[in-house]
Amino acid sequence: GPFDPRMGVIDIGKICKTCGQKNTECPGHFGHIELAMPIINYQFINILKKILKCVCFRCSKLLVNKNTQIVQNILNKNNKSRFNDICNLCSKIKRCGQDTEDGCGAQQPKKYFKNPGISDLYAEWDKLDFTTDDDLLDTTSKKQLLPTVYLYQLLERITDEDCEVMGFDSHFSRPEWLIHTVLPVPPPSMRPSVKQDNQRMDDDLSH
C-alpha cells in the first residue's frame, strides 16, 4: 500500500525494511504502480505525432535513407533542430521503402490527429491499401483509433540508431517512454501525514 514499510518510515523507533535505517536516517524509497494499459502522456502528444511521421506505421523503421548527404548534414545540428528537420523529410514519404532499400512497402497514414480534450490518437489513410500484422487494427477503415498498446509496441521497436538520428538519446529519452506504463509513488517522507485520535490522515497541503 501507500505506507508500505519498504518505502521508508516516518515514525520514531521503526526500521525501514529496505535500507535498515531509522526514520531520522532513511531518505525514503520510491514505489510504483503498474498500469493495466498504457496511457499517453497528454503533454507529449504533439511530439508523439511527429515521431509517428518519422517511422513506418508497420515495421517501425525510419522512413528516410540515413546515408544521404541531406540527412548527414542534418545530423550536425542540435537535437531539437534535427528532430524537426527529419520529421519534415519523412512527412513527404508515402510508402515505407520509397527512400530506403529495406522498407516493408507499407502505405503510411496521410495524417495523425487527436480529438479535442482527449489524448487518443487517430490515423487516416488516403485509400484502403495498407496492411498490418496486428489484430488491434482494422484494415477496412481509412480512419481509425490507434490503441495505446499498439503505439507503445511500435515505438518500442524503433532501433537505438534511428532514435539517435531523430535527435533522441537512446539511454535517457526512448520514444516509448512518452507513454505511461507505470506511475511513480513517492515515499511517505515526501507526503507527510497528520496523526489525530490514533489515526493517520493525509495532510491537505501535501497529499
Tell me the role of every PLM-derived stretch.
Residues G1-H207:
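Conserved core architecture of multi-subunit DNA-directed RNA polymerases
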